[in-house]
Amino acid sequence: MEAPYIDAVLKEWQLYTDVLVARPLIKEIHLGGGTPTFFKPSELKRLIEGIFERADIAEHHEFSFEGHPNNTSKAHLQLLYDLGFRRVSYGVQDYSEKVQKAIHRLQPFENVKRVTDQAREIGYTSVSHDLVFGLPFQTLDDVLYTIDKSNTLRPDRIAFYSYAHVPWIKGNGQRGFKDEDVPTGEVKRQLYEEGKQRLLQVGYAEIGMDHFALPTDSMYRAFEQHQLHRNFMGYTASKTQVMIGLGMSAISDSWYGFAQNEKDLEAYYERLEKNEIPVCKGHILNPEDLIIRRHILNLMCQFTTSWAQPELQFAEIDQVLQQLSEMQKDGLLHISEKQIDVTDEGKKFIRNICMAFDLRLQRKMPETKIFSMTV
């Protein structure tokens, strides 16, 4: 499985570089959307070196990857460090054994500590832990215990994600529990509120939607300097207008359009065998989309946006403000003549605020099945 898949990804990269007008200059690489440390170090080396062969590397670059605490070895960490990777994130989720059994992810704290310590010993400059609230059987004590345990390792960043319960999707691993075992909306809200307060108490700063960082981390500095950006992989300290996603179901972003690869492995292979870039669907942004995108990014990255400049104005702004009027009454945001500022209380509703700007979503809302609760 490993070698054929790496071969396929490198073939896809070749197809892209064959049609690009110039040799690509890589500023960022993120290995994720899954756990690349399931691959042997030798295969990861072949993948990254194969990518490097057809590109130049920017002097100031940032390479990161996602690691599973149970199968990330020191060999993985050393190899990727030698290839230029300096940031790693580990999927911790929750330290409660009952919760871990329900989500089929048993991983003791000792494994998280081992890979965190090893990354720092090797020289990684940023280690992140991904925590999740709203998991089946999860209690407030579980959330606080998980935060406190991770805090003993002092990761540079902590992502505090909401669990998305999508029971109508089959085969997604969410089957070690019943629907009633998942915390209700009100309980889930409490888990988030108390968890956020604990993170702030122990010295982490809120830097964006679901993300917290120590003041010494580059992500925090980017937030303070209004240089934070967000893409499909999450927050980043640099902005690039072209992001090429490689692999099954990967998403690419050229700023003016999105494209997604085949989600089925056989279909992905078949397209590559025909020397076709395996994109199965996409969307070209129109001028209105581009303006809306900038407002949503401003809100997600800085909790404020303005339409004082003509290039940030659009016809439906009054409709958006009407949608947000109730939130202003509730103290979640302030609306001035040509600007919105999200309050501290409103930060946890940032997804809802951004949804008011998503005109395409508003237009199809009556027929849309909301994928999961925003919190």
Where in this protein do the model-derived segments appear?
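Short, amphipathic alpha-helical interaction segments positioned at domain boundaries
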Residues: 347-375
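Short, cationic-aromatic polyanion-contact patches
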Residues: 99, 224, 339-357
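Short amphipathic alpha-helical interaction segments
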Residues: 314-328
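A short, conserved structural fragment
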Residues: 328-338
